[in-house]
């Protein structure tokens, strides 16, 4: 009996050692703050084709997050290298590919800092079936914006939009597999579902509204405000409608680093706090014709 117990104990200890060695190997290639400063380059991950936050025009990077990354790099006295993120099915995939492990095709590419990630205690503290933190190798910090859902409508088709109940009678465009899609399909006991039209992106839904295919679009406020700024159609209006039973209609956007690189997180958070306090963050959003709402801790 005793040898069997010892063998089992050895197996457990061996497994724990393997996990520890694996975890250490994941941190080995993560640049420290000092290494990043010495290299003279800050690698920042931003989402690809995500106007107004990070996108390209004629090969030139633009957007709120791009300019925020430029400002951070400038304040740190280093050059900026952007890493463009093609979003995975879940943000956990993006953390794995750009923060703690690297993409399976390019494990040598890893970001020092990632922008536009959820800043939410419940999300950060999620645990798997074994009770382990889902993203134990990631630190989410530094909220710099509050985002929310918004509906834009064609006022020639809908006189006023005070409740989403109006979509019992008017078609509304949403991005497929999005929160607005799930919400509108189930709201009012499913009575809106026949008028919910799906598109590959909010941009495609917005174009369909301009063409008269749908009478409204529900998507992220920043995205819709940007699209509104790119059109001269005065008939398109923002709705102040509430979204009953939506759940999280407002959320905060922050940043992420590898858990071993908290020194960078402290430095970057100090910089963004200063930008929020002195109005530079507001000015950055104004430049892209966006409403800017401070995170709760700064209000």
Label the predicted regions.
Residues 25-120:
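Extracytoplasmic small-molecule ligand-binding "clamshell" domains
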Residues 93, 117-132, 183-187, 210-211, ...:
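A ligand-binding cleft/hinge motif common to bilobed small-molecule-binding domains
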Residues 48, 144-150, 221, 229-269, ...:
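Periplasmic-binding protein-like
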Residues 24-27, 69-75, 153-158, 169-171, ...:
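Extended ligand-binding regions for polar small-molecule ligands
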Residues 46, 62-75, 146-191, 197, ...:
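Bilobed "Venus flytrap"/periplasmic-binding protein-like clamshell domains
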Residues 82-164:
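Acidic, polar ligand-binding/catalytic clefts
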Residues 8-18:
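Bacterial N-terminal signal peptides
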Residues 80-90, 174, 192-201:
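Short beta-strand-to-loop elements that line the ligand-binding cleft
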């Amino acid at each position: 009996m005793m040898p069997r117990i010892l063998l089992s104990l050895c197996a457990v200890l061996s497994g724990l050692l393997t996990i520890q060695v694996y975890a250490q190997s994941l941190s080995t290639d993560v640049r420290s703050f000092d290494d990043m400063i010495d290299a003279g380059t800050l690698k920042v991950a931003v989402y690809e084709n995500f106007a107004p936050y990070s996108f390209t025009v004629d090969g030139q990077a633009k957007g709120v997050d791009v300019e925020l990354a430029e400002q951070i790099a400038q304040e740190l006295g280093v050059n900026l290298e952007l890493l463009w993120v093609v979003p995975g099915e879940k943000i956990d995939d993006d953390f794995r590919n750009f923060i703690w492990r690297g993409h399976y095709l390019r494990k040598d590419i890893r970001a020092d800092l990632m922008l536009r990630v959820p800043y939410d205690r419940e999300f950060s503290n999620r645990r798997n079936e074994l009770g382990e933190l889902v993203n134990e190798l990631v630190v989410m910090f530094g909220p710099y914006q509050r985002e929310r859902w918004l509906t834009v409508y064609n006022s020639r088709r809908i006189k006023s939009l005070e409740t989403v109940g109006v979509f019992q009678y008017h078609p509304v465009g949403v991005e497929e597999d999005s929160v607005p899609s799930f919400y509108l399909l189930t709201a009012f006991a499913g009575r809106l579902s026949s008028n919910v039209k799906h598109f590959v992106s909010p941009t495609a839904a917005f174009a369909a509204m301009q063409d008269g295919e749908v009478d409204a679009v529900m998507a992220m406020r920043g995205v819709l405000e940007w699209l509104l700024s790119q059109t001269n159609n005065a008939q398109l209006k923002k709705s102040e409608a509430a979204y009953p039973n939506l759940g999280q209609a407002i959320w905060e956007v922050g940043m992420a680093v590898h858990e071993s690189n908290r020194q960078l997180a402290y430095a970057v958070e100090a910089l963004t706090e200063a930008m929020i306090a002195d109005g530079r963050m507001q000015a950055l959003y104004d430049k892209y014709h966006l409403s800017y709402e401070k995170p709760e801790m700064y209000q």
